[in-house]
């Protein structure tokens, strides 16, 4: 069976039997049509317990890529934190106790929704409660979502938070959309707006809930809410404690850097803060205490390939580069021996409905070059289905799928020419459900299964009831390498 192999991850493209508001179904996609007819295919589970999340919880790119790259189900921080809250372990956490003892005033910052991709509203509330019951003066800084949940769901979430804060005697201090507070693309002007807000230098309002409603009236939805502060909030002091409740790292790193790094040069800062505590490890370069340390994941797909002396290429555009490197490699940043990484810059547009093809064709070229060079294994992510799906623009999402389809056709042709096997799948769905039955926009991921196609010597059928954790062993089987005991079985 031994063959070189390309693993193609078509981010945000899932299977929805309902063709209404389904951008995948509506797209012209000759490459996919050919795959369905000619290549062994099946469906994989990408949500809930199949990827280490709570039952019914939609999957996401971080979890999906970790599952694919490690070849096993890793119980995600979301599940670990839920358990720690239930069994009261969180309030006993040593790093949390140290911060609460040291700092009288404590600020809780995070995305406030039940999306479960970056954070969870229940975690935010649990932290407010622990800090308030400890006798600290507590400030809530809510970041509105509108991306992993519907665009105007923030009103109910913020109403809930405001009432919760009032009952606890906690200050509801600031409000800001994730577009500003959670940028990950080095748009420092956005982060600066939020930094100024935390310092008490933003637009002041008597009621943050009314401010949110007013933003809706002006057609500004949750993701894009401009930073505002309660008129009684006077800003953070340098001796205050700051707790970040997002468990996913990629969209909190820049904010932590702005608040804490002594070497930060992107804009002038009035204050730097030392007493920070993060929910998980945001970046190894931050020497900060964390609530939930990383679980060590050994014998990942990339490690096994590297140890065997084979070469591998990991490529994607900016938006998904961390997913095919850091997350795919089991939460490790370091480059492995014989591993090459190619980062293709994402287009500089405000939202990707402005350019639905994104940088797919450049990513496609990088893959073809890798095949022509003879890389033993290539993993690539096409971001379009997900990133354009998040905009809620149905027509743009159709164009996104069509761009991916064109790229698939080119890669498949190149793979066949050079006798490569290929596996095509997605980390989760998104663009296959762009509106609900009432016509409300759906910008979030779905819980639908995703397609998997395997073209390799000797493969004629894929087993039933498989998930993302069965892909790594499949790649190793194609490469004729030993499958480590930590991995789940192959798809065939």
Swiss-Prot record:
Organism from which the protein derives: Campylobacter jejuni (strain RM1221)
Co-factor: note: Binds 2 manganese ions per subunit.
Record lineage: Bacteria, Pseudomonadati, Campylobacterota, Epsilonproteobacteria, Campylobacterales
SUPFAM superfamilies from the UniProt entry: 2,3-Bisphosphoglycerate-independent phosphoglycerate mutase, substrate-binding domain (SSF64158), Alkaline phosphatase-like (SSF53649)
Superkingdom of source: Bacteria
Known partners and oligomeric status: Monomer.
EC number: 5.4.2.12
Binding locations of Mn(2+) 2: 11, 61, 427-428
Keywords: Glycolysis, Isomerase, Manganese, Metal-binding
InterPro entries named among the record's database cross-references: Alkaline_phosphatase_core_sf (IPR017850), BPG-indep_PGM_N (IPR011258), Metalloenzyme (IPR006124), PGAM_B_sf (IPR036646), Pgm_bpd_ind (IPR005995)
Job description of the protein: Catalyzes the interconversion of 2-phosphoglycerate and 3-phosphoglycerate.
GO MF annotations in UniProt: manganese ion binding; phosphoglycerate mutase activity
Protein name (Swiss-Prot/TrEMBL): 2,3-bisphosphoglycerate-independent phosphoglycerate mutase
Catalysed reactions, as listed in the record: (2R)-2-phosphoglycerate = (2R)-3-phosphoglycerate
Residues where substrate binds: 118, 147-148, 178, 184, 248-251, 320
């Amino acid at each position: 069976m031994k063959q070189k192999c390309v693993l193609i991850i078509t981010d945000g493209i899932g299977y929805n039997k309902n063709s209404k508001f389904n951008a995948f179904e509506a797209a012209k996609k000759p490459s996919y049509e050919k795959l369905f007819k000619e290549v062994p295919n099946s469906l994989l589970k990408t949500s809930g317990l199949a990827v280490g999340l709570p039952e019914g919880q939609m999957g996401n790119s971080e979890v999906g890529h970790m599952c694919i790259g490690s070849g096993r189900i890793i119980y995600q921080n979301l599940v670990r934190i839920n358990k720690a809250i239930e069994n009261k372990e969180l309030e006993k956490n040593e790093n949390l106790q140290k911060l609460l003892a040291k700092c009288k005033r404590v600020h809780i910052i995070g995305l406030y929704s039940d999306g479960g991709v970056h954070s969870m509203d229940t975690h935010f509330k649990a932290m407010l409660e622990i800090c308030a019951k400890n006798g600290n003066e507590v400030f809530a800084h809510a970041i509105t979502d509108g991306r992993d949940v519907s665009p105007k769901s923030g009103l109910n979430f913020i109403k809930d938070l405001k009432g919760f804060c009032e009952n606890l005697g906690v200050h509801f201090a600031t409000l800001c959309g994730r577009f500003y507070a959670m940028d990950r693309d080095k748009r420092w002007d956005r982060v600066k707006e939020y930094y100024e807000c935390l310092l008490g230098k933003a637009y002041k309002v008597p009621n943050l809930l009314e401010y949110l409603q007013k933003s809706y009236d002006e057609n500004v939805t949750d993701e894009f809410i401009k930073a505002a502060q309660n008129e009684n909030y006077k800003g953070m002091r340098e001796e205050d404690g700051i707790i970040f409740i997002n468990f996913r790292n990629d969209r909190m790193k820049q904010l932590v850097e702005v608040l804490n790094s002594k070497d930060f040069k992107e804009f002038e800062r009035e204050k730097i803060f030392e007493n920070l505590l993060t929910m998980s490890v945001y970046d190894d370069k931050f020497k900060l205490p964390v609530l939930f340390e990383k679980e060590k994941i050994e014998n990942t797909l990339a490690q096994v390939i590297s140890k065997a002396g084979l070469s591998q290429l990991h490529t994607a555009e900016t938006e998904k580069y961390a997913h095919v490197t850091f997350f795919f490699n089991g939460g490790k940043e370091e480059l492995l021996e014989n591993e090459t990484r190619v980062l293709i810059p994402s287009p500089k547009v405000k939202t990707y409905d402005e350019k639905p093809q994104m940088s797919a064709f450049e990513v496609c070229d990088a893959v073809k070059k890798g095949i022509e060079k003879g890389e033993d294994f290539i993993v690539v992510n096409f971001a379009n289905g997900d990133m354009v799906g998040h905009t809620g623009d149905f027509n743009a999402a159709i164009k996104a799928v069509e761009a991916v389809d064109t790229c698939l056709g080119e890669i498949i042709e190149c793979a066949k020419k050079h006798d490569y096997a290929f596996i095509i799948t997605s980390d989760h769905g998104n663009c296959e459900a762009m509106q609900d039955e009432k016509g409300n926009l759906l910008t979030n991921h779905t819980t639908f299964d995703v397609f998997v196609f395997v073209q390799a010597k000797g493969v004629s059928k894929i087993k039933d009831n498989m998930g993302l954790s069965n892909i790594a062993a499949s790649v190793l089987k194609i490469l004729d390498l030993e499958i480590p005991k930590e991995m789940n079985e192959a798809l065939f």
